[in-house]
């Protein structure tokens, strides 16, 4: 195969590779510019399907370098169909998503966030995103607004004079940050990003803080990006630099050892991308997690291509993002996306 045969530009939306068959000379020798899905019917032995497929192999290339996710058949047949549907509907976003995951795998957090943001800005000007945005605008225009506005700041900040996370801990103060857009299920808007970044910047400068607790008010921790703000930016370069300048992701990563995030209900998009940078995520049993952005013609843009692979690996991240499917707290705990389930 040559590069042209492996690219979404030439109409190759994805590649399917049977991991139960021996490698052939026709298999890719470089990273294809489209998602590569490995399929296997081998029993799950606790070892990853890729590890099983490589054992005893003398392949001239490392399979894991270009297989983006592995599907276990027949158990994940429906999931495979969901993934193919997403890729087919948004091939450019899907190819960009797996490309970013591949490239950021060995980068630092700040470097990864730079790559993610540049890719996100690029896709904001893509036909796939513009089509999704147009379709959504037509739908929203037919639905009357009924919600009342939330009152007060979009991030509630409170400082406690002593740590209260553990009765045995008596040193240092605790900063609590609560997302406060309950009627919008704490949809992550520009104002929330800016207020969260401001509070975290202050926390970074305050060495007397021992703990930081982040939570959300209302029925959901965070239902993802505020869709009413999607497509508003007219300057992709300015939007990119704004994301890097006011970056809760980068700040949470710097403060991670101090941070506990308590999540519940919907944890969509930014609602899991940001917590994944923290040292500890405590989830209520009703928590659900999803990365729907590829279906919009975008990629996760709140740091998820950097934070989530560090918890669950590149392939599970690709599986989550390309399917758009949600997982419950139990699955998230098995993968390592969260650290504990607690009411």
Predicted ranges, named:
Residues 97, 177, 181, 195-196, ...:
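Terminal peptide-recognition signature
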Residues 79-141, 306-335, 339:
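Crotonase-superfamily enoyl-CoA hydratase/isomerase domain that binds
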Residues 1-30, 134-217:
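Conserved CoA-thioester-binding segment of acyl-CoA-metabolizing enzymes
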Residues 1-96, 100:
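Structured N-terminal alpha/beta-domain signature
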Residues 98-99, 219-222, 268:
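Short, active-site-adjacent cap segments at secondary-structure transitions
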Residues 42-87, 253-270, 274-343:
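Crotonase-fold acyl-CoA enzyme core
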Residues 46-48, 61-63, 216-248:
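Glycine- (often His-adjacent) and acidic-residue-rich active-site loop
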Residues 26-29, 199, 244-255:
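Catalytic-core regions built around general acid/base machinery
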